[in-house]
Design a protein with these regions (language model features):
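Conserved catalytic core of nucleotide polymerization and phosphodiester-bond processing enzymes
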Residues: 1-212
Length: 212
């Protein structure tokens, strides 16, 4: 979405994004990053994309306010493309009246022009959030369609029974589990080759949900 070439390359090279973010933000080698520092980076990698404030990061990562402020500033200094993308979403929301996912699904954004501060800031957060989470949802729906079609062809009787966030559960006979695993990995990892970012899928097999 932000077309951050460095971040895309890191994903495609299987680099631990949270560790690298921590190393860059704290200005230390990756091998010296502690679990606590990685946790802070993980909070910021996810939270800042969804409009997390300095106060929110401070509370979520158990940091002092000024530390959280410095971390966010360093993060956006390192990830200029992400800052430009998020700022651009607000401009689009105000000027065009909508934002959209990578695949073109739109959300109207009339409240970004509201004179009510609370209403306006909530709408701004939604405008920055929707294209990201919405694209994730689009990818998941596309993957489910592809998985369902392929299961019908290759594993008759297997069926999707639950979808939660970025995962799906397929119910099948025990002797079908290996082929179902292949279908899931192939179809979910290959759901959107046009985006240029490698999608990695892990598959687990169990007799019930608790074993997965």
């Amino acid at each position: 979405l932000a077309n951050d070439e460095g971040l895309i390359q890191d994903f495609n090279d299987d680099v631990d994004i949270h560790t690298k973010t921590a190393a860059e933000a704290f200005k230390i080698p990756m091998v010296e990053v502690t679990k606590a520092q990685r946790r802070v980076a993980k909070v910021i990698n996810f939270g800042i994309l969804y409009g997390m404030s300095t106060k929110g990061l401070s509370e979520a990562a158990d940091m002092r306010f000024y530390e959280a402020k410095n971390f966010i500033e360093n993060y956006f200094e390192l990830r200029k493309k992400i800052k430009e993308y998020l700022d651009g979403l607000l401009v689009q929301a105000r000027e065009q009246g909508y934002v959209e996912t990578l695949f073109g699904r739109r959300r109207p954004t009339p409240d970004v022009l509201s004179s009510n501060f609370v209403v306006r800031t909530a709408a701004e957060r939604a405008a920055q959030n929707m294209p990201i989470q919405g694209t994730e949802a689009d990818l998941m729906k596309r993957a489910m369609i592809q998985v369902s079609r392929e299961l019908d062809k290759r594993v008759p009787g297997a069926k999707m029974v639950v979808q939660v966030h970025d995962s799906v559960i397929v119910e099948c006979d025990e002797d079908q589990a290996e082929e179902v695993s292949r279908v899931l990995k192939e179809q979910m990892e290959g759901v959107a080759p046009e985006i240029g970012v490698k999608l990695k899928v892990d598959v687990s097999v169990g007799k019930d949900w608790g074993e997965l």
